[in-house]
């Protein structure tokens, strides 16, 4: 029986030819330490410190991702929505938390579509899957289909968080990484890694190059929410926290170079 064609999503960019070389179809280069990764991007960085999108930042991130995909690494992405909305902050201003969280989820979809556009400008075939059905712009979240896309050398971007209020996109990244069989969560930040204290308030704070999930939780180090770290700890999923603003750091992280902070069980 011939394989059925995947439906074209209305409103998305015209499909581009699939990569023809072996590396781009999912066979990692010898320089890559990891073959399948989940990249977590903070929404605030997409705004360049402002509300909305900074196209220059999104383009730079897309170029970094394209570099590792061309090397054969399978890349899935979860993006926050903090450049548009933060549910917890809106709640503090009097908005009902559930509704404000859903607004935040819509912000992550806007970021996902923007990244998809810039990745496809780089020639990288990309799919967006959302936890809330949005058939005009994205596929529904289906882990088996996501894995199939990755095996074909496509980037998969997961939007709308978990589709549930009270869950952060950090927790979404941990859950999606486990479900698609990623080897590591690459947590991209605007700082060099995990520090002994907030380096913006304490210039003498020291970078921690290696630490356990348990110690991060026990010391209350504010890198990601405790639920995400607990989920990774319980399932042996390593997290690499690194600075996205240093050009080429995604490739360095995938290649196993000693950058940032490696969090292991």
UniProtKB/Swiss-Prot annotation:
UMP binds at residues 81, 101, 162-169. Its EC number is 2.7.4.22. It is found in: Cytoplasm. GO terms for molecular function: ATP binding; UMP kinase activity. Pfam families: AA_kinase. ATP binds at residues 40-43, 82, 86, 195, 198. Pathway: Pyrimidine metabolism; CTP biosynthesis via de novo pathway; UDP from UMP (UMPK route): step 1/1. Inhibited by UTP. Keywords: ATP-binding, Cytoplasm, Kinase, Nucleotide-binding, Pyrimidine biosynthesis, Transferase. GO terms for cellular component: cytoplasm. Residues 1-29 are annotated as: Disordered. Coiled coil: none annotated. One of its GO terms (biological process) is 'de novo' CTP biosynthetic process. It catalyses: UMP + ATP = UDP + ADP. Belongs to the UMP kinase family. Homohexamer. Catalyzes the reversible phosphorylation of UMP to UDP. This is Uridylate kinase. It comes from Mycolicibacterium paratuberculosis (strain ATCC BAA-968 / K-10).
């Amino acid at each position: 029986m011939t394989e059925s064609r995947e439906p074209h999503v209305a409103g998305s960019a015209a499909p581009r030819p699939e990569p023809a070389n072996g590396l781009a179809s999912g066979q990692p280069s010898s320089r890559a330490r990891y073959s399948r990764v989940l990249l977590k991007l903070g929404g605030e960085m997409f705004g360049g410190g402002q509300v909305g999108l900074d196209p220059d930042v999104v383009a730079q991130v897309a170029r970094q991702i394209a570099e590792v995909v061309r090397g054969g690494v399978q890349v899935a992405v979860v993006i926050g929505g903090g450049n548009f909305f933060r549910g917890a902050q809106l709640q503090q201003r009097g908005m009902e938390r559930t509704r404000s969280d859903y607004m935040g989820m819509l912000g992550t979809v806007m970021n996902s579509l923007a990244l998809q556009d810039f990745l496809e400008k780089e020639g990288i075939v990309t799919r967006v899957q959302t936890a809330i059905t949005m058939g005009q712009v994205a596929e529904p979240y289906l882990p088996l289909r996501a894995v199939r896309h990755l095996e074909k050398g496509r980037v998969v971007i997961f939007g709308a968080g978990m589709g549930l209020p009270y869950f952060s996109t950090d927790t979404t990244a941990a859950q999606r990484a486990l479900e698609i069989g990623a080897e590591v969560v690459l947590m991209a930040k605007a700082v060099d890694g995990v520090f002994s204290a907030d380096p913006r308030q304490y210039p003498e704070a020291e970078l921690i190059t290696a630490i356990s999930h348990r110690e991060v939780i026990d010391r209350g180090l504010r890198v990601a929410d405790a639920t995400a770290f607990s989920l990774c700890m319980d399932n042996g999923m390593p997290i690499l926290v690194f600075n996205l603003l240093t050009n080429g750091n995604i490739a360095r992280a995938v290649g196993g170079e000693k950058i940032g902070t490696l969090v292991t069980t």
